[in-house]
């Protein structure tokens, strides 16, 4: 009797630990029905109860169960609202894809001027993501040459601004409340070559996945305005996020384009979240971020063991508040590998854009306590931050390593002028180049409070070899 009771108690303890999570992160385990979904073999009239009777759409599956399994190698052209449960995969092969790409079925670009082409986005000449006629979702972010896996696109404010290959334009109505569905019926492209001979698809606007109190794992997301917008108690694990953003941000009073890979927006008690072992690439803005409103500061958010390539920034954070006491509580960006930030995203940027770096902190009221720990940064400018009381002490830095080229900056100010501290390319007034370099790093440490980042200065060729090697290494994940 004693043995039975002890065994029963042990099981109860295990179940309790499993339900509340590990390390403060709530895993929100689902307890309902498991549903199989396949875009190649499924039908929404099926039961979805087995791999032999899968449903067709994720939307339908979410009305049936709360553990959703997507078939490997399949592509799902839809946006997802995940407010409980879990999305994962089944079968062998590549990760299933949630895609926002809208592919031209038969090339029909028309030339309207020298090097300027036009295409209608509302007809039925497309496969892939269906925007169903006039729609704000036709707010294109990038053009993807899918046979070469190249993305292009610099979205501009006026048609008359088109001047370089892959410049694109859609509407003059870009301020908050101005744009209608019809403003995005047509896309204009500047290109010296004839685009009718290229295999092109467009990324649509909107958010691929909104989630809270849920888990997503082993899924690829591509070709949307945003990748994942996550709330409290979210787990994102072993996912791929690629080709995100470039669209006009329509709720802004100024002309600006957007595009974040994984974003935690601060509201409603944002807490207990985890992003781990993901691969994030080619984001117009940042790969990873925590941002938004106080007075509900975020707590216990972890980004760890991720790989980030070719994004404008690997990390961004800010509070939309004037409260100097608002902080990131136990929020950590750690053990990540970040490669080639701000250099070759595939997107084009308007002249004067300065926020191209590994880490961007838009906090204007001092140190908010965001922790950067044991990360490796390779190729790209290091840190961009707001200056407060004469210093850039916006984060906590512990044990990071940065492989950096001469001429790239250690710190750049985003307010109160354009102050930059670079790794020098010449000795200047110093006796040696090493002395000039030591002084630049000393000034950086004094301004930021970062006493631990190890800066490894390498030649262009060495950095480029490291980037190539890392891309090859992590492409196999």
Please tell me what each predicted stretch does:
Residues 4-25:
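Classical Sec-dependent N-terminal signal peptides that target proteins to the secretory pathway
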Residues 36-234, 245-259, 263-265, 406, ...:
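Extracellular polysaccharide-degrading/modifying enzymes targeting complex plant/algal/animal polysaccharides
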Residues 79-80, 205-208, 224-230, 245-261, ...:
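Short glycine/acidic-rich loop motifs that flank beta-strands on beta-rich extracellular proteins
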Residues 82-85, 212-214, 230-235, 271-272, ...:
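Short "repeat-start/strand-capping" segments in structured domains, especially the N-termini
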Residues 373-380, 390-405:
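Catalytic-core region of carbohydrate-active enzymes that cleave or remodel glycosidic bonds
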């Amino acid at each position: 009797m004693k043995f039975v009771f002890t065994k029963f108690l042990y099981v109860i303890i295990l179940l309790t630990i499993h339900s509340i999570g590990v390390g403060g992160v709530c895993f929100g385990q689902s307890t309902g029905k498991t549903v199989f979904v396949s875009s190649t073999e499924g039908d929404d009239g099926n039961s979805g109860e087995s791999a032999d009777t899968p449903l067709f759409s994720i939307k339908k599956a979410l009305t049936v169960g709360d553990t959703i399994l997507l078939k490997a190698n399949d592509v799902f052209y839809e946006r997802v609202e995940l407010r409980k449960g879990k999305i994962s995969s089944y079968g062998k092969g590549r990760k299933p894809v949630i895609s926002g790409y809208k592919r031209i079925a038969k090339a029909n670009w028309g030339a309207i001027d020298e090097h300027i082409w036009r295409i209608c986005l509302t007809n039925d000449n497309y496969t892939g993501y269906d925007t169903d006629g006039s729609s704000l979702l036709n707010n294109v972010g990038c053009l993807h040459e899918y046979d070469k896996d190249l993305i292009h696109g610099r979205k501009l404010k006026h048609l008359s601004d088109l001047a370089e290959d892959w410049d694109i334009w859609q509407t003059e109505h870009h301020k908050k409340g101005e744009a209608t569905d019809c403003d995005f019926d047509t896309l204009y492209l500047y290109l010296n070559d004839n685009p009718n001979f290229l295999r092109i698809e467009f990324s649509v606007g909107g958010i691929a996945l909104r989630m809270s109190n849920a888990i997503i794992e082993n899924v690829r997301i591509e070709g949307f305005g945003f990748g994942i917008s996550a709330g409290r108690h979210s787990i994102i694990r072993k996912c791929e996020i690629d080709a995100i953003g470039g669209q006009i941000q329509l709720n802004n009073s100024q002309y600006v384009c957007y595009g974040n890979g994984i974003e935690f927006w601060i509201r409603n008690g944002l807490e207990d979240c985890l992003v781990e072992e993901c691969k994030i690439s080619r984001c117009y803005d940042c790969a990873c971020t925590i941002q938004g409103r106080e007075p509900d500061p975020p707590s216990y958010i972890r980004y760890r063991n991720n790989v980030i390539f070719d994004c404008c920034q690997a990390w961004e954070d800010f509070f939309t508040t004037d409260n100097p006491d608002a902080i990131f509580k136990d929020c950590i960006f750690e053990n990540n590998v970040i490669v080639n930030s701000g250099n070759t995203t595939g997107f084009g940027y308007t002249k004067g854009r300065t926020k191209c770096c590994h880490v961007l902190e838009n906090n204007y009221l001092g140190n908010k306590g965001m922790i950067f720990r044991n990360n490796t940064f390779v190729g790209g400018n290091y840190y961009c931050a707001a200056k407060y009381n004469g210093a850039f002490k916006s984060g906590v830095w512990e044990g990071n390593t940065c492989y950096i080229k001469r001429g790239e900056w250690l710190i750049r100010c985003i307010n109160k002028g354009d102050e930059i501290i670079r790794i020098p390319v010449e000795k200047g007034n110093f006796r040696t180049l090493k002395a000039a370099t030591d002084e630049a790093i000393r000034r950086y440490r004094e301004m930021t409070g970062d006493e631990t980042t190890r800066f490894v200065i390498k030649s262009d060729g060495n950095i480029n070899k490291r980037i190539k090697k890392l891309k090859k290494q992590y492409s196999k994940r």
